[in-house]
C-alpha cells in the first residue's frame, strides 16, 4: 500500500490461497476447508482432472489439449469467484498471475470474463496479466518488496 509491503497486524496479509472459496469444501494442508489453493492451484487442478477422467496428467498437459468441459467450467467458476473477491476488496490496478497456473492461457480471456461476471462493479477494468519472471515471479516480487 502506497509503495510499501502490507504485512497486516499478524503478518498474514496477502494469503489469498487460504481465503475460503467453498465453505465445507476440500480439506487443506493448513487444517481448514475450502481454501482457494485446494481448487485453483496446479496440484488441485490435476487432482480434479484425475477424479473426472481417471487420467494422471500435469496441468501443462491438460491445458495443451481440449480440457474436459466440466473441469474447465469448475476451474473458471472457482477462478472467477476467488479473484472477484480480491478485486472487490482491494480494487487493484492490475492482477498479475504467478505460479504454474499462470501458464494456463485461457485465464487471460475466459478467466477475465469469469471474474467480470462475479465482481461487484458493472465496469471492471482490472487487467489480468501473466508475470514476466516465470513460475516463481511471486517469490521474486516478495523478496524485492521486503527489502
Regions found by a protein language model. Name each.
Residues 12-21:
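Short, intrinsically disordered, charge-biased short linear motifs at domain edges
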Residues 5, 20-28, 32-147:
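ATP-binding/phosphotransfer module of carbohydrate and carboxylate kinases, centering on a glycine-rich
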Residues 1-2:
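A cytosolic small-molecule/anion-sensing beta-strand core signal
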Amino acid at each position: 500500500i502506497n509503495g510499501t509491503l502490507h504485512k497486516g497486524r499478524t503478518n498474514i496479509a496477502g494469503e489469498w490461497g487460504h481465503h475460503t472459496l467453498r465453505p465445507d469444501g476440500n480439506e487443506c494442508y493448513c487444517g481448514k476447508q475450502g481454501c482457494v489453493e485446494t481448487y485453483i492451484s496446479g496440484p488441485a487442478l490435476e487432482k480434479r482432472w484425475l477424479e473426472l477422467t481417471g487420467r494422471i496428467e500435469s496441468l501443462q498437459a491438460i491445458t495443451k489439449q481440449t480440457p474436459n468441459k466440466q473441469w474447465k467450467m469448475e476451474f473458471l467458476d472457482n477462478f472467477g469467484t476467488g479473484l472477484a473477491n480480491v478485486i472487490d476488496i482491494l480494487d487493484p490496478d492490475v492482477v498479475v498471475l504467478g505460479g504454474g497456473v499462470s501458464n494456463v492461457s485461457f485465464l487471460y480471456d475466459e478467466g477475465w470474463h469469469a471474474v467480470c461476471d462475479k465482481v461487484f462493479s458493472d465496469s471492471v477494468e482490472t487487467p489480468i496479466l501473466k508475470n514476466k519472471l516465470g513460475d516463481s515471479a511471486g517469490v521474486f516480487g516478495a523478496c524485492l518488496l521486503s527489502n
